[in-house]
Amino acid sequence: MKKVLFYLLLFICSFSTATFAQSYRRVSEKEALYIAQKQFTGKDVDYSTSSGIIPENDTIPLSIRQADVANRLSMRYPFRSNNADEVREQPVYLNVTTTAAGQLAEKVGDDINNVDSLIVNGPINDTDFYTLWSGTFYGRLSVINLENAEIINGVIPEWAFCRPKEQVIDGYIYSIGLRRIIFPEGLKVIGKSAFNFVDNLKYINIPTSLQRIESSAFTLCWLLKTNPLVFPEGFEKLEERAFMNCSELKGSVVLPSTIKEIGALAFYSSKITSINFPEGLEEIGNEAFRGCRFKEVVISNPNIIWSGESQFGYNFKLEKISLPEEMTYIPPRFLEYCIELKDFRIPSDVKVIKSGAFNECYNLQKLELPAGLEEIEDQAFSKCNALEEIVFPASLKTLGAESCTNWTNIKRIYSMAAESPVCKVNMNSGATPFYSPNDSDPGTPNDIPVYVPTGTAEKYRNTKGWDYFTNFIETDDFPTSTINDINIEQQESKQGIYDMSGRKVTTTEKGKVYIINGKKVFIDNNSH
């Protein structure tokens, strides 16, 4: 019997924010249920009365609920060791046909606790899903084939195979033995927490009829390895934590043109390596792909809503990301700790780079900031150790505290602004954009050349934050960005006006960047 310490489960599920406890304590069943439910849903739940999330006893088939917990637990996995893959030599399967929903317990009888595989034909409802769960928890059931079943309303109910009220016993949470389930066509929705903590589940299929996967549906399915994971046309919403901590979920995810929303933490800490983002995608939630293993990301829809932060943070393998030119800001902690990212060009319409957006991108060597950028927030580029040169545009107005700290290899800084950008100061630590008392030695060097417009050096020297530097050099010869990353034929680029996506245009707009006669030009009036 697999037994997992409940608090260890909580630690694994929230490792990014929790600290590891050195000791454990047993808790009452009621307290454990409360903590489990709060962890799974993020909400407080009163277990003194039914919340409606866990089935009431009157929905449980009498033949199942009559047995007491101790007896039923003793029946679980008599043919297995703790390894769910070690099955007995002669597995038993059963083929059952129902004529009406709610009949499954009657049809299978005591065999529900003795079969390894179950094929279900005919209509099934929430009560039947309880019967299926019972066989996976109290019995031997590990494979369920619903290919020819008719799920009433096309919905797998909430908490179908995760029932904390019964799985948490004496402060421990017991997992179920389900290894594979085959879903039928006609399935539209997989309900909230339906397979939460089904940690032996390895294989699922996605029917062409599926439209939505609700929150935490497959959270903590550590062994799930369906590859590729293909969502059908008509699928619209992947809710928060849907595949959170599915650490064996590797390979490709294919999204349909119909998808509208990817919720917070949807693929958090999974190991998927590639995904497409259709143009119709409208929203990507907080930490949706944090900890994945993408090498390249391409986003084309400029109107995506970025909810929360760190949508692609901690993607250790990420080497390239392309964003639409029309993006107006980079979300907070958007690419933090993407340690293989070496080269990045901020989209031309970006005005604000939010806090921590590129924090600890240690190998970022080349960074192109757009003309028109106005603000770089706190810690936006902190610990980008590989940077050797940066050009702050003339439009820059504000630098956040610690936004440029620990640039240990920086050789030169260019600031094109005639008015020295305001440097924010952390009132608690005293940190400025280029200095922090927490800097690792040697931090950002203060004796490198800082190039500023002619006639402004004294102004920079007397500005809090900029006074960190000792070597200001006045110049009117600032470096210009190359156009190698714009897909325009060389001859054509010298004969017309193009936007930053390489599309030929006839007119320009004030405040945007264009390629004019082969050079990037920031338009501060409508003279072209």
Question: Language-model segments: which ranges?
Answer:
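Bacterial Sec-dependent N-terminal signal peptides
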Residues: M1-R25
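Low-complexity, Pro/Thr/Ser/Gly/Ala-rich linker/spacer regions in secreted
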Residues: R72, R76-N95, E474-N487
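Structural signature of tandem-repeat unit edges
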Residues: Q90-T98, D116-I124, L141-G154, E166-V189, ...
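C-terminal tail/sorting-segment detector
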Residues: V513-H528
